[in-house]
Structure formats: structure tokens, C-alpha cells
Amino acid sequence: MKVAIFGGTFNPIHIGHLIMAQYVKNFSEVDRVIFVPNGVPPHKNVDIALPEDRFEMVKLSIEDNPDFEISDFEIKNKEPSWTINTLNYFATSYEKVYFILGSDNLFEIIKWYRAEEILKKFPIIVLPRERNTTLIRRQIEELGIQFSAKMVLIDMPIIDISSTEIRRLIRENKSIRYMVHPKVEEYIIRKGLYKE
């Protein structure tokens, strides 16, 4: 089975994440998209909900889609969530492992822990975060030349929703309806998440 690993803080998961994952399933050769919420994100120290809450929100968002699944690999691991460790873990169980990367991280990936190994070993599905893809395509080409990286850019609409904006709306007691799965909205309200 060919799988695409969709890692992230998912703080909280929103419809943009779900649409991106569905585009990956629709327009690549992967059989399944595996959501992997970060346990201890190495590069972020913002207002992050408990790993268990973020895991539950992802689970609620994807439970009715047979093409999606969730893994607690990073959440169970108490070490920082390094991408290479996660990809290597899944590579032991699946025929082919792809890595989903937002184009905003395309220019940062070479600074990541064991970046060269990621780029040489795993094919990468790039999702655009901006309308003009000229620089993105150029960077994909350069990484291909420098590291023999296998990358493909999925042509899809820009989904301009962010978890940061959702958390701000919650703090201001504004509605997040249509921005997250209804079950996630219900969960956030019930648990009182992101109020402070």
C-alpha cells in the first residue's frame, strides 16, 4: 500500500487540512492519507492544546472517510517529533511512503533535522500555499538537482484558513462554524479549548 504522511500540529484541525488531504488522495497515486498529529513539535511553542485533544479532533474529522486514517506514533513518542523518524517508522510497514509538505515549508526543509535523508529517501507531495507557483516550481527543481529529490506539486485551490485564526476567533467568542468539522466545533466548545 502507498501512503502519504500528513504531519502537523492540527491545533485545531480545520477544513483546509481535510481538503488538502482529499486533493492528495484524488491527484496522486497514494491509497491512503495518514494524519500524524505532533506530540512535541520541535519548531513551535504557541498555545498548543494537549496532544490527546488534538488527536481526538483529528479522529472526529476523518472518521467517516475510508481513505484517511490517524496515527498516534508522534503523540506516544515523548521525544521531539522529527519528520525523518516518523517517515522511517512508516517505511517499515508500507510499500511506499510519501511526505505531504506545504509550500511554505519547501524553502525551510533544507534546515530540518536530517533534511538530506528526507529529500533523498522519500517522495514529497507539495501543496501550494500561495497562488503564484513560479518560485515553488523553481525550488522543487533546485531540490531535485541538489538532492535527487522526487517532488510533485498538486494543483489545487488555496485554502486560506489557519489554526491561528480559528484560535483567535474562539478567544473572541466568535463562531468557527464551517471552518472546522461540526464534531470538532462541538468538541472545542465542550472541552473549553483555546479560550485563553
Swiss-Prot record:
<keyword id="KW-0520">NAD</keyword>
<comment type="similarity">
    <text>Belongs to the NadD family.</text>
</comment>
<keyword id="KW-0547">Nucleotide-binding</keyword>
<dbReference type="GO" id="GO:0005524">
    <property type="term" value="F:ATP binding"/>
</dbReference>
<dbReference type="GO" id="GO:0004515">
    <property type="term" value="F:nicotinate-nucleotide adenylyltransferase activity"/>
</dbReference>
<dbReference type="InterPro" id="IPR004821">
    <property type="entry name" value="Cyt_trans-like"/>
</dbReference>
<dbReference type="Pfam" id="PF01467">
    <property type="entry name" value="CTP_transf_like"/>
</dbReference>
<dbReference type="InterPro" id="IPR005248">
    <property type="entry name" value="NadD/NMNAT"/>
</dbReference>
<comment type="pathway">
    <text>Cofactor biosynthesis; NAD(+) biosynthesis; deamido-NAD(+) from nicotinate D-ribonucleotide: step 1/1.</text>
</comment>
<keyword id="KW-0067">ATP-binding</keyword>
<dbReference type="GO" id="GO:0009435">
    <property type="term" value="P:NAD biosynthetic process"/>
</dbReference>
<keyword id="KW-0808">Transferase</keyword>
<dbReference type="InterPro" id="IPR014729">
    <property type="entry name" value="Rossmann-like_a/b/a_fold"/>
</dbReference>
<comment type="function">
    <text>Catalyzes the reversible adenylation of nicotinate mononucleotide (NaMN) to nicotinic acid adenine dinucleotide (NaAD).</text>
</comment>
<keyword id="KW-0662">Pyridine nucleotide biosynthesis</keyword>
<protein>
    <recommendedName>
        <fullName>Probable nicotinate-nucleotide adenylyltransferase</fullName>
        <ecNumber>2.7.7.18</ecNumber>
    </recommendedName>
</protein>
<keyword id="KW-0548">Nucleotidyltransferase</keyword>
